[in-house]
A protein has these predicted regions:
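Short, glycine/charged-enriched secondary-structure capping and boundary segments
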Residues: 31-33, 97-101
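General beta-strand structural signal in soluble alpha/beta enzymes
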Residues: 44-48, 84-86, 111-112
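Long, hydrophobic/aromatic-enriched structural stretches that serve as scaffold segments
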Residues: 69, 73-99
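ATP/NTP phosphate-donor binding region
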Residues: 1-79
Length: 112
């Protein structure tokens, strides 16, 4: 059986990536999340398409390519210590086949 590897504990000053891997989200409802993150001493960092809008029968935060770019950026960026999905749900399953997990396996992160 493989050993479970947990991410390191977060410390003040760590960066938390805010991404939207599924539906779009407005900035105003995210404000309480940003306030919470900042109040704990962490630095929220938005993905390039976190507040994007793309409609294709469903209101996504971006095209599939844009959403996977944000997710892979957050997973593989050494400066990011945790990932906070602004919302999840429908649309996320389309991204799984595009995940690039090489760095993530070496340095796992909390996914919230």
């Amino acid at each position: 059986m493989k050993e479970i590897i947990f991410p390191k504990s977060l410390k003040k000053g760590d960066k938390i990536a805010i991404i939207s891997p599924a539906g779009f989200v407005e900035e105003a409802p995210l404000q309480s999340t940003l306030n919470l993150i900042k109040s704990k001493g962490y630095e929220p960092v938005f993905g390039k398409h976190t507040l994007g809008k793309f409609t294709n029968g469903y209101n996504y935060s971006g095209t599939e390519k844009e959403r996977i770019q944000d997710l892979n950026w957050a997973l593989n960026n050494d400066e990011i210590s945790a990932i906070w999905a602004s919302r999840g749900g429908y649309g996320c399953q389309h991204l799984l086949r595009h995940l690039k997990l090489s760095k993530f396996r070496e340095k796992p992160k909390w996914y919230i």
